[in-house]
Amino acid sequence: MRKPFLFLCLFCWCFCVSAQRYQQLVKLGLEQLQADSLLQAEATFREALDVDPLIKSNALLYQYIGNIQERRGEFQKALDSYKIGLTISSTTISLLLCRAALYLRLDNQERSMADYTEVLNLEPNQTEALFYRAYLYTQHRDYKRARADYDRLVKLEPMNEKARLGLAILNDKDRRPREAMEQLDALAQLFPSHASIYLVRGGMYLSRKQYELAQSDIEHAIELEPENPDCYVSRSQLYKALKKKNLAKADAQKAIRLGADPSFLTP
C-alpha cells in the first residue's frame, strides 16, 4: 500500500516545483518586459509555457508575447499570438482589446468592430470598447449606433474628454453643427490647455469658411503644443484654403519632420 502513496507524494512534489518554477518565470518575464528587454522577456514567457503548457493563465502569456511582437512591428505574428491566447480563454477581455486595437491599427475595421462588440457582450460598460466602437460606427456613418455608445460612455465618465470630443465630431457629421460647436466651446472651458480641442474646433471653422476663427484656434493650439505635428497639418490646410501655397508647403514639411503621415498632406 505504500507504493501508491509514495507515487502520489512524488507527483504532488513535482507539481509544486513546476508551479513554483512557472510563477518565477512569469515574474521574471514581467520584470524584463518593464525594463524593455523584449527578446529576453519573450524567451522567458516561452520557457514558462513549456513548463506548464496546459494552464489557463497561458492566455495572458500569449498576450504579453503578442504585445512584444507588436512593438517589434511583427503584426501578423502578434495576431497569431492573440489568436492562440483566445483559443485558451475566449473571454479574456484584455486579449480581445489587444487584438481589436491591432486590427484597428491595420485598418481591418470589420474585425476590430467584431472584437470590440465581443468585449461589450462580456462587459457592457467597458469604456475602451465603447469609445472605439463609437469611433468605428462614426467612420461607417452609422451615427445612431455611434451616438448610443458615446452617450453611454459619457454617462459612465462625464469628464471623459475623448468621448465628449468624439460626440462633438459626430454631431458635426450628423448635421448638428450648432450642438457640435456648443460642445466644443464647453470642452474648451473645461480643458483650456488641450490643443486637440482647438484643432477640432478650428477644423470645423475651416469647413465653414470662417477663416479668422479657424486661424485663431489653430494658432492657439500651436502655442500650447508647438511640437505636435497635427497643429501644422491643420495650419497647412488652412493656408491651402487661403491660397497661401508657400506657407502651406512650409507647414506641411514641418509636420512631416515632426512625424506626420505624408499621405495626409498630399494636394
Please state what every model-predicted region is.
Residues Y22-Q23, K56-L60, I93-S94, T127-E128, ...:
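Helix-start (N-cap) detector for alpha-helical repeat units in TPR-like alpha-solenoids
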Residues V233-P267:
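Terminal, low-structured helical/coil segments at or just beyond the last alpha-helical repeat
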